[in-house]
Every structure is written in structure tokens, then in C-alpha cells.
Design a protein with these regions (language model features):
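Nucleotide-activated chemistry modules centered on ATP-dependent adenylation/adenylyltransferase
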Residues: 1-229
Length: 229
């Protein structure tokens, strides 16, 4: 049985998929998809100023390896002052060589003024975190480095927007975002990590780690209540 939308998958199903990934995706299937994706990245970035967004999440870890194979070696990560200490330490140890850290500086004082952002109760509030940290940092990097395109690890299987009938689009602020993993399944991501023996940050070993994914600690979803969070 294949995994469905990320938000509707129980964390135990993720762990089962990780444990049995060889049965779901063969090395041959993965290698063919990898080669096609690297070719797609090359086709969209040749002769252009390009970089990739790295979040230390599982999708971006795969994205980074594919972009580097395609010759795109500049990258960035958006963080704030509310990251888990263990996650921040993992980023420093494992970030790509060409990765620039952009801190948007939301801190505990900011959180006190925006209590609705603590442990989001719905996807709309959770999406605001992505907007104010990752998307803002991407925009800053894009403009500062005068990029033509920034490459993201967004996938349709996560319910992410990747473009209308394509995997590339330009937003209202002039930032062109390209998502070469758009058609990759959850299983493809897990298989790439498994076959290439890639390390993952500690979040994935925590309770509901695959369900929540990487995030600043106040952005944690599915806590049930602020007290539980």
C-alpha cells in the first residue's frame, strides 16, 4: 500500500514504509528517476543563475544531492531564533558546503506578541510560518544574488503548489520557483535516502517526526493543545 497525502498519514505508516522501502522501490527504478530528474534540473538551469533551497528536511536533503549532481552548488536555508537546539546543531554539521544561512529572527519576544502562531491549530496558521521564515528567506536570497531561478523540494504528494500544469512558476514578487521533485512519491524520497545512506535530522526520530517534518518548535502541529505542545 502506498502512502497518501502527508497530512493524512499516521506516523506509524511512515515508519513502516521506511522499514520496507526496498519492497516498494527498487534501486533500478530509483536510479532511472534520479537520472531523469537531474536532466530536468540541468535543462531548467543551463546558462542561468540558480541555487536551491535546503531546509534540512528529507525532501530538501534529496533535492540537494540531485542539484549538486546537476552542477547547481549554491544553496540557502531560512531559519529563525526559535529552532530546536538539536536541529540547529544538526544543520551546522550537515549543511551543504555552499549553503548560506538566512535568519529571519523571529524570537520569543516576537512569539509573545503573536500568540496565535504558537502550535498552529490548522494548516493556514502553519502555512504562515513557511511564509514568514522560508519564503521570506528565499526571496531575500533570490534578490540579493540576482537569481533567475530558485529550486525547491516541493512535491504534489505533500499537497504543495508547484505551478499550474508545470513544475515552475514566478510569484507576484518576481521570484521564480522550480520544483523538480514535483512528481516524486513519498516512497521515492525514502528510497533515495535509504539507498544513498543519507543521514536525517533528529526530528524524524521524535514523536510524529515524519508527520510534522522540520519546523521551528512553536510551529509544531498536532499537539492537541498548548499544554501538550
Amino acid at each position: 500500500m502506498s502512502l497518501g497525502r502527508k497530512q493524512s498519514i499516521d506516523n506509524s505508516a511512515w515508519l513502516e514504509a521506511v522499514a520496507t522501502i526496498e519492497n516498494a522501490v527498487s534501486r533500478e527504478e530509483l536510479d532511472a528517476l534520479t537520472a531523469a530528474t537531474v536532466a530536468d534540473i540541468k535543462a531548467h538551469t543551463e546558462g542561468k543563475a540558480a541555487a536551491y533551497a535546503w531546509s534540512a528536511g528529507k525532501d530538501s536533503i534529496v533535492l540537494g544531492k540531485l542539484c549538486e549532481a546537476a552542477g547547481v552548488t549554491d544553496s540557502m536555508i531560512g531559519v529563525c531564533d526559535l529552532e530546536y537546539p538539536a536541529f540547529a546543531a544538526w544543520i551546522e554539521e550537515h549543511k551543504p558546503a555552499g549553503c548560506e544561512v538566512i535568519n529571519t529572527h523571529q524570537n520569543i519576544d516576537w512569539l509573545a506578541k503573536h500568540p496565535e502562531m504558537l502550535f498552529p491549530a490548522d494548516s493556514a496558521a502553519a502555512g504562515r510560518w513557511f511564509s514568514i521564515v522560508q519564503h521570506r528567506a528565499q526571496r531575500i536570497y533570490f534578490k540579493t544574488h540576482k537569481l533567475d531561478v530558485i529550486i525547491l523540494g516541493r512535491r504534489r504528494a505533500d499537497g504543495n503548489y508547484v505551478g499550474r500544469n508545470s513544475n515552475i512558476y514566478t510569484d507576484g514578487k518576481g521570484v521564480t520557483r522550480f520544483s523538480p521533485l514535483a512528481a516524486w512519491s513519498h516512497e521515492h524520497i525514502l528510497a533515495f535516502i535509504y539507498y544513498h545512506k543519507l543521514p536525517l535530522p533528529p526530528i524524524y526520530g521524535w514523536k510524529n517526526g515524519y508527520l510534522c517534518g522540520t519546523h521551528p518548535w512553536p510551529a509544531r502541529q498536532w499537539t492537541g493543545s498548548i499544554e501538550n505542545g
